[in-house]
């Protein structure tokens, strides 16, 4: 579904000739046919779909730009677009304040900016200002409603990397990725081109931009997928459980977000929140003292350590849960992490609660030396008493990455071991293995899917159904919701 038809409309003036594949060619705007979608039929003017192949050249921009629906689409929005060559740039609109900015140095973009400013200065916006959307609605609902109501065109409009006067195929260098709330769709039979002229002579232009610079500049708006490099709108990313909208890849998730989606509201009771490391071996690196580094991560993440532990309810079932956070020193396991997990398991043993530990760690924390390695044995000992002696139920959830001492200890000790899709799970990393053994590690040999077929753990469960899967597992092992226990008693 196209969202950018309005962007191309600003290109259509006496210096920017923009051709479309329309149903027929004619000399006046009034003759343009109505679209097939009844919602789009305007008794005054309407833009046709993209399906047919004849050409029509627009000579004025007022008709295109002063359609009343344009004010239902944009007010104050930033859009990031990327073409098939990987070049990206951003477009910022603020029509109320007469601001139009494009983050690129191309003279073509300067042409657009100049034209847009002159358009606003003509006072055209007053005519249709009352059609601006109501700001009481959320951005998401506004965009969704606009798309559903007005943009059911079959038109494929985009800006080419090489702008020429010839008609070319849509797939040959046109912008194919429009970063908004939905992915772009196009009709392969359509074609479009843009020709610019300066002082009577034609010339070609190419937009160039650095993806990394744009990602840094707009990272407060977008989250880039590690797998497909697609961009996800940050406001909606948490509600989608940090799953990429483009490819379904599971990105890293903070411990607080995991607790929020896993534990029932108003049931979370944290344990040992104030426990912090005292730098037992007085580790000092050339770059930064260990204590300063701990303080830095505490300010950055709002956590005291690389794990949150506590008691809560999962669909009404009381549980003890520990969630590691990779954002805090790579989720490394030091003395505090080991002590908090041990206390959690001991509490669950005394209260006969099921235990969940969500693993996301690079392994033992080197800044605490052998003391961090001892946490592996300590946790394993507490887990043995919990599982073998008390016959209670422990579920281990392996997320990306789970490596080192965590994999070698409590990560693989669960009665049921669950992995997330595409999770990186290993004891030693690929680089370490290759440098130590002088052997090449095949790509994908440390992914959850490969290890699942080798029998390393039980199911691979995506985040969306995970809470329901855990609830069924607990009930299967005799852990029932509190309200159900009361009814049976």
Curated annotation (Swiss-Prot):
Binds 1 zinc ion per subunit. InterPro entries: AcCoA_carboxyl_beta (IPR034733), Acetyl_CoA_COase_Trfase_b_su (IPR000438), ClpP/crotonase-like_dom_sf (IPR029045), COA_CT_N (IPR011762). Transmembrane segments: none annotated. It is found in: Plastid, Chloroplast stroma. Pfam families: Carboxyl_trans. It catalyses: N(6)-carboxybiotinyl-L-lysyl-[protein] + acetyl-CoA = N(6)-biotinyl-L-lysyl-[protein] + malonyl-CoA. Residues 185-201 have a biased composition (Low complexity). Zn(2+) binds at residues 225, 228, 244, 247. Pathway: Lipid metabolism; malonyl-CoA biosynthesis; malonyl-CoA from acetyl-CoA: step 1/1. GO terms for molecular function: acetyl-CoA carboxylase activity; ATP binding; carboxyl- or carbamoyltransferase activity; zinc ion binding. Belongs to the AccD/PCCB family. HAMAP family: AcetylCoA_CT_beta. Acetyl-CoA carboxylase is a heterohexamer composed of biotin carboxyl carrier protein, biotin carboxylase and 2 subunits each of ACCase subunit alpha and ACCase plastid-coded subunit beta (accD). This is Acetyl-coenzyme A carboxylase carboxyl transferase subunit beta, chloroplastic. It comes from Dioscorea elephantipes. The lineage of its organism: Eukaryota, Viridiplantae, Streptophyta, Embryophyta, Tracheophyta.
